[in-house]
Amino acid sequence: MEVQVWLRWYTRILDDFGFDRRADEESASYLDAFLREHGCLRVDDIDVPSSDFIVFGAGPSLRSHLKRFRALDEPMTVISADGATTALLEEDVLPDIIVTDLDGKMEDIIEANRQGAVVVVHAHGNNLPALRRYLPLLQNIIGTTQSIPHGCLHNFGGFTDGDRAVFLAAALGAGRIVLAGMDFGEVVTRYSRPDMDSELGPADPVKRLKLEYASRLIDWLERNGDVRIERW
């Protein structure tokens, strides 16, 4: 997605959610400064084992789709969206790439990163404290912003961790992207909300609107991108 196209989406998102663009850009500036000092990965630095990608979201279908994936006998590039990383590690699946705004179960994201997963860290107006806390614990980081990219930061398109992961796969040259654990419904899991006591719970209105945007953005990519999207 071209930046100018994304910015039209972004303007609507700011209006619908009441987000502060200046806060987004403050967090982005912090992430950029950290990466300039500690190492600035680019897209070309990511080795992908296959042009067939699978993106795991943290929806209710995640566990069943993980079992389906493990039964496959084909190489795929595996991307986990934030909290889905925990479920992958529970099934002994190490993602190649993690896309996160640092509100999943961080000990699992840190462990997967330690084992070799590249972490694509997203800056937005609500996660500056998390950036300060967790960036020093991570390595092999690519930075993203939801505003105008600059310095070490990219903007591939996408709003939530899940659809950003899909847009990242497209930017990495995917020919096929399988969507797994991406339900876009009214139920969330403990992988999406680590503070939740039960396995499943209702999505609040903000979460439902975020998932609606995620679904619409992926639909846009399917219509306009040069990639085949397969929904499990």
From Swiss-Prot:
SUPFAM superfamilies for this protein: Thiamin pyrophosphokinase, catalytic domain
Domain of life, per lineage: Archaea
Known EC number: 2.7.6.3
Signal sequence extent: none
Gene Ontology MF terms in the entry: 2-amino-4-hydroxy-6-hydroxymethyldihydropteridine diphosphokinase activity; ATP binding; kinase activity; magnesium ion binding; thiamine diphosphokinase activity
Record keywords: ATP-binding, Kinase, Magnesium, Nucleotide-binding, Transferase
Cofactor dependency: Mg(2+)
Chemical reaction(s) catalysed: 6-hydroxymethyl-7,8-dihydropterin + ATP = (7,8-dihydropterin-6-yl)methyl diphosphate + AMP + H(+)
InterPro entries on file: HMPDK_MptE, MptE-like, TPK_catalytic_sf
Annotated GO biological process: tetrahydromethanopterin biosynthetic process; thiamine diphosphate biosynthetic process
EC class (word): transferase
Pathway info: Cofactor biosynthesis; 5,6,7,8-tetrahydromethanopterin biosynthesis
Chain segments annotated as coiled-coil in the UniProt record: none
Annotated family: Belongs to the archaeal 6-HMPDK family.
Function: Catalyzes the transfer of diphosphate from ATP to 6-hydroxymethyl-7,8-dihydropterin (6-HMD), leading to 6-hydroxymethyl-7,8-dihydropterin diphosphate (6-HMDP).
Entry-linked HAMAP family: HMPDK_arch (MF_02131)
Protein's name according to its UniProt entry: 6-hydroxymethyl-7,8-dihydropterin pyrophosphokinase
Organism for this UniProt entry: Methanothermobacter thermautotrophicus (strain ATCC 29096 / DSM 1053 / JCM 10044 / NBRC 100330 / Delta H) (Methanobacterium thermoautotrophicum)
Lineage, broadest ranks: Archaea, Methanobacteriati, Methanobacteriota, Methanomada group, Methanobacteria
